[in-house]
Design a protein with these regions (language model features):
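Compact, glycine-rich, soluble single-domain proteins
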Residues: 6-56, 64
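C-terminal structural segments of small proteins and small subunits
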Residues: 53-89
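Absolute protein N-terminus
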Residues: 1-3
Length: 89
């Protein structure tokens, strides 16, 4: 499953939102990736997510693949919205 989001957090996906996303993604067995500007990272890796340098207004994609992919996609969407990280495009 793939969803596209736009970052609304004024400081982008920095340490705090990255930590929240990684924590949520780590609850699932599925492969969960985040893609920005042609680069892809494992959403379960704080260093990978931070290295992408996703700023406010940027579009990024989250892909989930595996046994619990649908549940993972819903959970990640909920975190992105509830934490003010971004909104689904």
């Amino acid at each position: 499953m793939e969803k596209t989001y736009v970052v609304t957090d004024e400081t982008g996906i920095h340490a705090r939102p990255a930590t929240v996303l990684v924590s949520e993604a780590s609850k699932f067995e599925s492969n969960i990736n985040i893609e920005y500007n042609g680069k892809k990272a494992n959403l379960k890796s704080i260093m990978g997510v931070m290295a992408l340098g996703i700023m406010q207004g940027a579009e990024f994609k989250v892909t989930t693949d595996g046994a619990d992919a649908d549940d993972a996609a819903k959970a990640i969407s909920n975190v992105i919205a509830s934490q003010g990280i971004g909104k689904e495009k």
